[in-house]
Amino acid sequence: MNWTIIIIEAIVLIGAFTAMILIPLVKNPVWWIADYPEDIQEEYFKTHERIPSKFFTPTVLLKKGMALLIALALLLVVVWLAGAYDFWSALDVGYGIWLLIDWYDCFFLDWVLFANMKSVRLPGTEHMDEAYHQKKYHFVQSCWGMLIGLIPCLIGAGIYTWLFC
């Protein structure tokens, strides 16, 4: 496998992930409302119309499902470019990059950037500094992301092995 390619892929995918999250969030913080802690959502809904914000709603499942399909497609390209030679090497590359992005999302985007970036706060919750700095909430969400990430990575490694090995 080519580690230079893997590092370049990781950097490019982190940039793409950041853009995919940050652009809609800056334009309309409500877009990702299901990803905010519940106390922030409840404060927002005190002064705004209630919209579906639980994880198992059609809107949220559609957004997350599309993201998983895109991740699966990207995974196939990533492991092919990296030179994966069997199921396990494809899984290592794919899930390794998934974990890197997951941890970047938790430890940098959620804990540092979004916790301190006033422009992504929901209207009416700007005063809730402590709620936006809930590290445990984002860490638990990151753990769920690690588990969910196994699905496209295992499927992708299987498809890759079937197609290219």
Regions found by a protein language model. Give the residues of each.
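Juxtamembrane "helix-exit" motif on the non-cytosolic side of transmembrane helices
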Residues: 78-84, 163
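Short membrane-interface loop/juxtamembrane segments of multi-pass integral membrane proteins
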Residues: 41-56, 123-141
